Amino acid sequence: MADLQNLEAVADHPNGSAIASPRSSTDSRSPSTRSQSLRLNHSNHQHRQSFSESLRAAPGSPRTRRQPSFTQAAIQSLIDNPPAPKDVNPAFAGRDWREISIGELVRPDDLRFVELDTGIEEATNTLIDSDAPVLLIRETPEHKTAVGTFDYSDLNAYLLLAAGLTQPNEELRESYEELARKARDEHKIPLKDVKELSRSEPLTTLPASANLMTAVETFGGGVHRVVVVDEHNNGEVVGIVSQFRLVKFLWENGRSFPVIDQLYPQYLRDLGIGSREVISINGDKQLCEALQIMNSEGISSIAVVDNHSNVVGNISTTDVKLLTRSSSLPLLHNTCIHFISVILSARGLIEGKDSFPVFYVNPSSTLAHTVAKMVATKSHRLWVTDPLSPSSSGPPTPSHSSVQLPLAASTNSTQSPPVSPPATTTNLPAPNYSTPHLPSPPQPFMNAASLTHPAASVGMPHGVAPSIPASALPGARLSGRLVGVVSLTDILNLHARASGLSPADPAESRSRRRRSSSSSVSVRKSGDIGRELFSRRD
C-alpha cells in the first residue's frame, strides 16, 4: 500500500519527473532483492578497482622516449667553452691588441676623490655610498694628481685597530698614540694619519698612451690596479684600470687576440696556473680572526671551510662595509658562518640577489669557463675544489692553515692530500644534511657604548639565533674539498707569458705585501679610536 502511494505521488508531480521519495524506516524490498543489489554494488566496486589499477600500469608519456635536444657531450662542451658576449665594442674590432692604449679603457665616472685632510668617517661614507672599489687621495681639491688610495683593505686595517684587535709596529707606536689622543678629544682623524697604519699596495701609475701589453705585464706581476695619467698634462689623473676590467676586456674581445684566444679551451691542470698555497679559516672561528688574517697576509679574501676542508663560503675585505656601524660590532666576535648569512641577507635585501657566495672551479675546468665565471660573478679569485672528494675523506681542517695541495685533483677519491696538523680540538658531529641553513637578516645589536666594554660584545646578541656550525654544513654537496685558488693575477700572468713578456713573480708581490703589513695580531683592547669610525648609526 505504501509503495502504491509513492507511485501516485510521483505521477502527480507537476513536472512529471521521477523524483525519489525518502525511503521509509522499514525497507519493503524482499531479502532476495536486497542481496542482488549488494552483489551488483560489490561487482561495480571491483570493476572500479580494476580500472584504477590499470591506470597505474599505463604506458609512459611519449616525452620520456623523446631524444634530448643536447647530448651530454654537447652540454659539457658548452660548459667548457661558453660563448663570449656578442656586443663587442666595434672600436676594437680587427685591431691588434698591442696597439690599443690603456687610456681607451678608462671611464671618467670611476674617479672618486678625497683629500688628505678628509676624515675617516667621511671617507668611509664616500667609499660605501659611491659603490666605488677605491678612492683616490689628493692633497687639495685643486690638485689633479693622486698621492694615494683608500680602499676596503685600508678600512679593514683601521677597523681592526679601532676595535683594539691589532697593535702597530714599534716605529708606528707614536702615530697610534696620536690617533688615540685625537679620538679621546673627539677630533677628526684625517686620512693622512690613517694611511700610515696600512702600508698596502703602492700607488702604480701608467701613462694613458701605454699599450695593453704594458698593462698585462704590470698586472701579471701582482699589481691590482693602476692609475692612468695624462703624461702631457702634468700627470693629471684621467682614470683607473683594474685587473678585473682588463680581464673582462680581453674576454669580450678575445677573438681579436689570437695569442690569448687559443688559451681559453685548455684546462687549468694543463696550464698549471693557480696557487697551491691556500689560506683558509674554519667557519666556526670568529670573524675578527678572518679579518686579522686578511690584514696580516695582505690578501683581499679568504675561503671559509668546514671541518673537512670543503668550501662553504667566502669573506672579502669588501664585506667590511657591513661592519662600520656601531650596532654591527658584536659580529666581530660571532662566527664566520654567521657573517656569511649576514652577507647573504644584505645581498638579498639591498641588491636583490639570491646566491650562495661560493665561487669555485675544479682542475678540469677550462680557462674559458673560469674567466666566464669570474666575469659573471665579478670575482677576483675562484677557489679550486676537488668535487669528487666525499666530505668524510679528510681530517678535520685547522682553524687557520696554509696548506700545500696539488692543483690537479687525484683520481682516487679516497686518498687525502697532505694538510697541516689537525687542530687540537675535539671532533665535531657529522654533518646533518636534513637541517637547512637559512640566512637570517642582520639584526641591530648594541650601541657604541659596547666599544668601551669589549666583554659585553662577546656573547650572543639578544634576539639572534645561533648560526648552524660549519660542521653541520653540507659543504661537499656545494663545492668540494679546497685544493687551490686561481686569481685575476694568475690569468693575466699567463696572458703575459704567452705573449712573450716577462712579468714579475706574483708570489714575490704577495711577499712584499706581507712584509709591508704594519700590524701584528694582538688582543689589546681600546675603544677610543673606534668612536670616530663607528659613529655611523642605523
Swiss-Prot record:
Keyword S-adenosyl-L-methionine: no
Compositionally biased region (Basic and acidic residues): 525-538
Assigned GO CC terms: cytoplasm; nucleus
Compartments in which it is found: Cytoplasm; Nucleus
Gene Ontology biological process terms in this record: cellular response to glucose starvation; regulation of mitotic metaphase/anaphase transition
Stretches for region Disordered: 1-69, 386-448, 500-538
PROSITE patterns the UniProt entry points to: CBS (PS51371)
Tree of life domain: Eukaryota
Residues annotated as domain CBS: 106-171, 197-256, 274-331, 360-419
Keywords, comma-separated and alphabetical: CBS domain, Cytoplasm, Nucleus, Repeat
Transmembrane segments: none
Keyword Zinc listed: no
Gene Ontology molecular function, alphabetical: protein serine/threonine phosphatase inhibitor activity
Stored PANTHER family: AMP-ACTIVATED PROTEIN KINASE, GAMMA REGULATORY SUBUNIT, CBS DOMAIN-CONTAINING PROTEIN
Assigned protein family: Belongs to the SDS23 family.
Name of the featured protein: Protein sds23
Organism of this sequence: Neosartorya fischeri (strain ATCC 1020 / DSM 3700 / CBS 544.65 / FGSC A1164 / JCM 1740 / NRRL 181 / WB 181)
Taxon lineage: Eukaryota, Fungi, Dikarya, Ascomycota, Pezizomycotina
